[in-house]
Structure formats: C-alpha cells, structure tokens
Amino acid sequence: MHLRHLILILLEILLFDYIVSVLLYLKYFLLLLENLNGEPELAEVHYMPDNLEDTQEYFEQIQSPNLRWSFTINHAHFDPIGIKGFVEGMDMCLCEEVRVADNNGEYEIHMKPGTGNVDFGEMFRLIESSGFKGHYMNGFGSLDDMLEGREYLLERAFEQGIGINS
C-alpha cells in the first residue's frame, strides 16, 4: 500500500470521528450526508461516501435521528448501480431531500433536465414508490434554468401518474 493511500485512510477515519463528534454536540441540528461521485484512481481528491456501500456504512455506524441522506441523482446516475441501485439499496425513509440535475452518465456534471440521459419519469416512479417523504431540490444552472427545469420535471412526473406538490 502506498503512503498516499494510508494517509487517505487516516483522513477518512478522522473525518468519520469528526462527524460522530458533530452529531453528539449538535444534537439539535440536522446533518445531511450526500452521496458523492467516484473519482478516477489517480485523482487528487476522493470523495466519501462515493458509492452505495460507503453510504450505507455511514448510516450503520452513526445511528442518529439527526443524520439524514441527501440523494444526489446525477451522482448516482453515473455510478455502475445507477439511480435504481441507490434507491433499492438505501432506506429511503432516511432521505430528507433528492437533489436533481441531469447527467451524461459518464462523469460528474450538473446539467439542466432534458439535456442529459437521466430518465426522470423512471426516477420519480422509483423514488415516490420507495417511502420517500422529503423534498426535491434542483441543483443546476441559474435560477431561470432551475425554474424552467422544474416545469420539465413536473411534466415527467405527471407522465408517470405522479402528482408532485408544487
């Protein structure tokens, strides 16, 4: 194992301990853990958690009503298990918000809905049938882009027979 990998492992342990400390001391605040995106092996930064297993481990190790999940679908979209794998693998009752942006399925990018290849109708069907009770939040472009994207997303939900509170 390279020294760099040992340092990254130690940093992950320290970060995990720090999160536990934050939850102990800030018991009146809500902390959302986002599923991040994987990075190439030689990348300078490796985000945590960047896959389903890491995300599950955080929730198994830190049992607190103050730790909830922020599900970023465009990060999940280019993960090998995809959006469906995350929705089926996580307890969606732990999900406080779904962060929405389109993606090309190849790398980290926050695109306006309809410009990438996320199947938003299927995404809404999966999430709305999973026990999710939180809110959706757009995470792409300008305010005008997000308002326009909101209409596109509502249309995709409606096509699936899903009424989203607007």
Task: Describe the residue ranges of each PLM region.
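Histidine-acidic metal/acid-base catalytic patches
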Residues: 2-3, 13-17, 49-166
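Short, surface-exposed loop/turn motifs that are enriched in glycine and acidic residues
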Residues: 8, 41-48, 73-76
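Active-site groove signature of glycoside hydrolases
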Residues: 1-8, 29-39, 137
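Basic- and aromatic-lined ligand-binding clefts that recognize polyanionic substrates
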Residues: 28-62
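An active-site-proximal structural segment forming one wall of the substrate-binding cleft
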Residues: 10-27
